[in-house]
Amino acid sequence: MALRVPKASGPQLFREGYRIMQGVEDAVIRNCNAIRELSEITRTSLGPNGKNKIVVNHLQQTFLTNDAATIIRELEVIHPAAKLVVDATQQQENELGDAANFVVVFTGELLAKAENMIRMGLTPLEIAKGYEMALSHTMEVLEEICADKIETVESEKELIKAIRTCISSKQYGNEDFLSDLVAKAILTVLPKDPSKFNVDNIRVVKIMGSSLYNSQVVKGMVFPREPEGTVTRSKEAKVAVFSCPLDISQTETKGTVLLHNAQEMLDFSKGEENLIESHIKEIYDAGVRVVVTSGNVNDLVLHYLNRFEILVIRVPSKFELRRLCRVVGATPLARMGVPMPEEMGSVDVVETIEIGGDRVTVFRQVEDITRTATIVLRGATKTYLDDLERAIDDGVNIVKALVKDNRLIFGAGASDMQLCIRLISVGEKTPGIYQHAIKQYGEAFEVVPRTISENAGLDPTDVISKLYAAHHKENGESIGVDVECENDGTLDAKEAGIFDVLLAKKSAIRLATETVLTVLNVDQVVMSKPAGGPKPPGPNPHWDDD
């Protein structure tokens, strides 16, 4: 009789509370469903008519936006497979600024197609291999369907052509004004070698009130606060930056002072006053006319700064202080004292101006190319201004992609339909089991024009059938979805000036596909029991990003 040894199962291997999911049904299908649920949330925000979401995070901060990267970042996703999509979206947003929602939606659609093929009898490995083959064909097709290119990033008209579509997906109706604003800001700080362009050189200041169309670009830096003292303007001044409070150091020991008469009381604080006066006079004699500090300013120090007509402003943010140092060319000092000549910076004009009902301080450079430009945004509510800022950040980030690759493809879902048709054709010519995965990969691109038409209130089936008919005709590769539905639901993206940046599209497709391949190659999910006890406190919402 054969000896039968019982197999050790999961509960005998691990501590109590572990969850083990294995097999195609439990591991792969459940992961697919989780990611599809996430993609359904952001899918309604795709395109110019994408809907806004109100998200309240664990710190009770409210976000009103249709920016997919912001939405899923603040949703606090805990599913391990869905977190892969969150990471991919954040990478796309940080590197290129555009097509973040495409990553989520396309990943969800690919996994929906994969789930159907698994139920048909294909294995996840066969599907993954087919998707890999389809990805390489997609990159080849994208090279072939390039529609245009940016001749030079130093031209405002050429920049607007690339930025406009990206901004219209976030702020439809305001894209012309905002793209013009972003293009002006970029050209203000663009170095002679465009490849050295730094997105941090463009900052946004939000001032509530008035309308968006009163927004403007200011050369230099704008701080939404007034100087601390009575001096509000300085020209061609040397700047000293202190990363400490402007105060004299106090001893840690406590002491009791015995005063015998009134004269001793009058003389008691004279030593402190003389010390501060000598400090400020030394700073003045060194040529400094503007002082910037990140800490508080002592009343006595402020008195002597006003007496010597030195402008002093407080910048509490470490990030802004570091950026200001880069603008004026100064080195931040850790204690109050006279800066060395190489530690001082210089600025052409520091002045206080009124924007709306608020007074702001401007550090302005006179020359044509400045180190920093500030976009001053106006709007009615804080959430609206925050959403405008996200749209501007995406528009600025697009320039990073244009510097690396200046080619454009047709937008409005036209390039997606072209990819769909060509990949289905490739799949039909591919022998063997992988042809199913390649064809399904191609059909997944249909989700973009379908979703754009759905969100615009059109009949998606009717629009898709018209797009198929148009793209099978000669010179029909530029036909996309018309969200304003002036004709039959389709338009010529070339005539409408709707273009996507090729590099952003390539990156989004690659990130989505790699995420799908990772999920399909998972055969087991092992989750431990969450640790007990109180949850760790969240980050302080008033801290800087640094």
Swiss-Prot record:
Among the GO biological process terms of this entry, one is: protein folding
What CDD domains does this protein's entry cite?
TCP1_theta (cd03341)
Record InterPro entries: Chap_CCT_theta, Chaperone_TCP-1, Chaperonin_TCP-1_CS, Cpn60/GroEL/TCP-1, GroEL-like_apical_dom_sf, GROEL-like_equatorial_sf, TCP-1-like_intermed_sf
Provide the residue span(s) of the region labelled Disordered: 527-546
Disulfide linkages recorded for this protein, renumbered to the chain, are none
Q: Which domain of life is it from?
A: Eukaryota
Q: Name one GO cellular component term.
A: cytoskeleton
Q: Which residues cross the membrane?
A: none
Q: Which UniProt keywords apply?
A: ATP-binding, Chaperone, Cytoplasm, Nucleotide-binding
Q: Which cell locations does it reside in? A: Cytoplasm
Q: Which Pfam families match?
A: Cpn60_TCP1
Picking any one GO molecular function of the record gives: ATP hydrolysis activity
Quaternary state and interactors: Heterooligomeric complex of about 850 to 900 kDa that forms two stacked rings, 12 to 16 nm in diameter.
Q: What does this protein do?
A: Molecular chaperone; assists the folding of proteins upon ATP hydrolysis. Known to play a role, in vitro, in the folding of actin and tubulin.
Provide the family line.
Answer: Belongs to the TCP-1 chaperonin family.
UniProt protein name = Probable T-complex protein 1 subunit theta
Organism listed in the record: Schizosaccharomyces pombe (strain 972 / ATCC 24843)
